[in-house]
Every structure is written in C-alpha cells, then in structure tokens.
C-alpha cells in the first residue's frame, strides 16, 4: 500500500518510521520538501518526499499529521480527494495546550471531513504520543488505538493498518465518535 503523510514533524516522522519499518512505501508531503529531505532519506529507500499535492496524488491512504490549525486548509487545498482515505491524526488543542478548542457538538475530524471534498475521513493516531507511534511495544501489552469514521470499509482498512503497527486497533464507530477521542 502506498501511504502519504502530510507533515514531517514529530507525529509524521514517527508514523513514517514505523510504516517504513513494516515495509510500507511512504511519501511525505510538505510545502518545502528540501527542508526535510535529509531526515526522510534516513528512513530508507521506501520513504520519499515531495510537495503536498504530489504526495496526496501518490497515496492510496493519506495521513494528515499537521498542526490542527492547518488541517482544514490542507484538506481544502485538494479539489477532489477521489474517495481516498484521509486519516486525521490531529487534535484541536487550545492555546497553551489548555484543553480542546472544540466542544462536544463537533470534532476536528468532522471539520476536516467537511473541508475534504470526496475524502473518506477516518480519525486515528491521535490518542498517543509520537514516541509510541515510532515504537508501540510495551511489555504490558498493546496500546489501545480507536479508529472512527463514517465509511465502514475505510475504518476497517485503517484498523488493520493500526494493528499492523503493533497497536490494538478498535473500530470505534462513526466519525462523530471523534468528539470524545
């Protein structure tokens, strides 16, 4: 499977490292590919980097790993997602990490879905830190990772992907459940 990761910060790089270690091909999409070229090259031959639009075009699954403030803009920047699975790994954190910037009547994932025309949006990878994404192994067992989205097939594929990375992937139901993740 070809996976695009939009963003090359802590979360994006940790997920990329874990995915490449599992044999997946990963293309990172960022506004300035030159800035991250060396870091991506260290991940090996299965990792590459390009502009955001090129990465979205190349990925069967696209993981959104940018700050929440940029998420809707990235989602809107693609005219038609063409039924690609868009995994929202963001958290709508308030300034100074003082809680969430949204209440319980909507979620960041629902807002991303509204901005991402034609995407099958799934929420995942937002309930643990980047250090756990790079290495999900614990002596006490697997880390619980809820996955929610309105498209059952997309949810199923991402539960399988999450599980392949060593997490205990769990189908958490429709995208509205992201309000509580």
Annotate each language-model stretch with its function.
Residues 1-2, 85, 144:
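Residues that mark the start of a beta-strand
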Residues 26-28, 86, 171:
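Short beta-strand "acidic-cap" motif of Rossmann-like dinucleotide-binding folds
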Residues 90-137:
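Rossmann-fold NAD(P)-binding glycine/threonine-rich loop
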Residues 1-42:
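NAD(P)+-binding Rossmann beta1-loop-alpha1 motif at the extreme N-terminus of oxidoreductases
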Residues 114-121, 139-178:
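Internal alpha-helical scaffold of NAD(P)-dependent oxidoreductase catalytic cores
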Residues 44-96:
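Rossmann-like NAD(P)-binding element
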């Amino acid at each position: 499977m070809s996976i695009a990761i939009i963003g090359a910060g802590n979360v994006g790089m940790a997920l990329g490292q874990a995915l490449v270690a599992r044999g997946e091909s990963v293309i990172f999409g960022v506004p300035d590919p030159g800035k991250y070229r060396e870091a991506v090259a260290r991940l090996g031959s299965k990792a590459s980097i390009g502009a955001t639009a090129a990465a979205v075009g190349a990925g069967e699954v696209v993981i959104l790993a940018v700050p929440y403030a940029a998420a809707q803009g990235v989602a809107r920047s693609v005219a038609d997602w063409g039924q690609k699975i868009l995994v929202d790994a963001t958290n709508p954190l308030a300034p100074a990490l003082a809680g969430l910037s949204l209440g319980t009547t909507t979620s960041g994932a629902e807002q991303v879905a509204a901005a991402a025309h034609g995407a099958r949006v799934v929420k995942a990878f937002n309930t643990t830190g980047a250090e756990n994404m790079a290495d999900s192994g614990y002596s006490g067992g697997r880390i619980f990772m809820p996955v929610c989205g309105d498209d059952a097939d997309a949810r199923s594929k991402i539960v399988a992907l999450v599980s392949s990375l060593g997490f205990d992937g769990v189908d958490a139901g429709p995208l509205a459940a992201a309000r509580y993740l």
